[in-house]
């Protein structure tokens, strides 16, 4: 009787211990999955292009090209020497894929938006606000042909001052005539649409010339074409305003 009772107790303990081990394995598995997911986020999505090693401001863990410390998961500052192409993790090239830029921007902004850091440390909140603003600037610059070209010149230490007149007289005459056409289309929807289409074609051709110039490392040619793009972009903005005033819908 006593032996039977001991056996039953031993069996029950073994069953309980077995269940405990199963639960422990299950919890460990979940924990491992969580770490794997966090690592995937850190290594695949939340990275920028940099060769400079850094240390986490929160725990001093060494990391490289990661927005979140892989040790304590705290948001990190970006190195100051990064350009907009580095920030979005794309190759420095005038020819870009706007869809790729948009996807990367959305992924990063979704993780870096200040609303995500309401309950975090004050420094982390400030970093979030700074990075989110920087990301907006990078996106608006690289998705705009003129801004992208001017920014690439800026990276080479070249700028085009506002109000520059270093363009040939024939081109200035051409721009004056275009502006007169815009002025004469104030109440003419069809003319506004036609002028917008023509201007779009001109800007597209100029953009291709800029791409060729940068591809050939000809910054003087790129600068000359970008100056022309500035004038035609100004005309484009006037036509867009007219289009809105006249209630023209695409």
Model-derived regions: residue spans:
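C-terminal accessory/regulatory regions appended to core domains
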Residues: 2-250
């Amino acid at each position: 009787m006593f032996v039977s009772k001991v056996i039953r107790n031993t069996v029950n303990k073994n069953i309980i211990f077995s269940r405990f081990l199963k639960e422990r394995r299950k919890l460990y598995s979940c924990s491992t999955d969580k770490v794997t997911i966090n690592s995937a986020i850190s290594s695949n999505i939340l990275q920028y292009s940099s060769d400079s090693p850094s240390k986490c401001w929160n725990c001093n863990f060494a990391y490289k090209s990661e927005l979140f410390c892989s040790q304590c998961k705290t948001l990190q500052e970006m190195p100051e020497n990064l350009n907009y192409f580095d920030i979005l993790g794309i190759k420095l090239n005038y020819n870009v894929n706007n869809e790729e830029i948009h996807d990367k921007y959305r992924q990063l902004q979704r993780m870096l938006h200040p609303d995500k850091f309401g309950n975090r440390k004050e420094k982390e909140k400030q970093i979030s606000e700074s990075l989110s603003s920087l990301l907006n600037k990078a996106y608006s610059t690289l998705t705009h042909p003129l801004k992208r070209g001017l920014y690439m010149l800026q990276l080479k230490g070249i700028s085009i001052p506002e109000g520059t007149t270093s363009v040939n007289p024939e081109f200035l005459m051409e721009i004056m005539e275009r502006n007169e056409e815009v002025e004469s289309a104030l109440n003419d929807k069809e003319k506004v649409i036609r002028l917008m289409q023509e201007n779009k074609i001109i800007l597209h051709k100029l953009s291709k010339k800029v791409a060729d110039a940068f591809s050939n490392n000809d910054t003087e040619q790129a600068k000359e074409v970008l100056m022309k793009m500035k004038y035609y972009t100004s005309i484009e903005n006037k036509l867009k305003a007219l289009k809105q005033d006249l209630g023209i819908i695409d």
